[in-house]
Amino acid sequence: MNQENFIRRYFIIGERRFSNYWWATVILIGSFGFLLTGISSYISTSLNSTALSSNIESQMQLPFFLSMLKNSNSTGAINFFPQGLLMCFYGSLGFLLSIYWWCLIFWNVGGGFNEFNKKENFIRIFRWGYPGKNRKIDLYYTLKDVESIRVEILQGFDSQRTIFLKLKGNREIPITGIGQPLTLQEIEKQASELANFLQVSLEGL
């Protein structure tokens, strides 16, 4: 028998999904747009409200972009208060959210693998967590601790499809990824293959 007959390993993507890359990028670009709009409204409002602005212009030439901002404010550009201030506020929130999202992607929170090893008689559940004490979540169980494989399917707006590893002592360990539910066919196939491989019963289907 080859290696595949003794060892099964299922990889969990975690936060490094295409959808997370997409939304983190979109939010980052959008937040920069809001911040630049708010900052430009502050600069243009300041230039127009400062009594010395005309004297400064007469003595030295303003940079091109400052002159454009000053002129744009007189032609209907937004004021810093309250529109520009709100733009800065929402832009800052979006920027912080995008940075947090990129950190999750970099750390790959929730990513890892499930290994079922008949050759050495163990099950290994590995996940990456947040930086700190629990950065690595590495759990080991023996094959004889497994009683069955249970599938839980919750339908609705936020549908969830989860495979649980039922262990002795009424313990249940979820072994599917979070945030990207598998299709019903994929759940059935993976659960059936795993139950056959471990030679335990399958519950929930």
Swiss-Prot record:
Lineage: Eukaryota, Viridiplantae, Chlorophyta, core chlorophytes, Chlorophyceae
Highest rank taxon of the organism: Eukaryota
Keywords: Chloroplast, Membrane, Photosynthesis, Plastid, Thylakoid, Transmembrane, Transmembrane helix
UniProt function note: Seems to be required for the assembly of the photosystem I complex.
Family, similarity comment: Belongs to the Ycf4 family.
Cell location: Plastid, Chloroplast thylakoid membrane
InterPro entries on file: PSI_Ycf4_assembly (IPR003359)
A GO term from the CC aspect: photosystem I
Residue stretches spanning the membrane: 23-43, 86-106
Name the record gives this protein: Photosystem I assembly protein Ycf4
Pfam families: Ycf4
GO biological processes: photosynthesis
Entry membrane topology: Multi-pass membrane protein
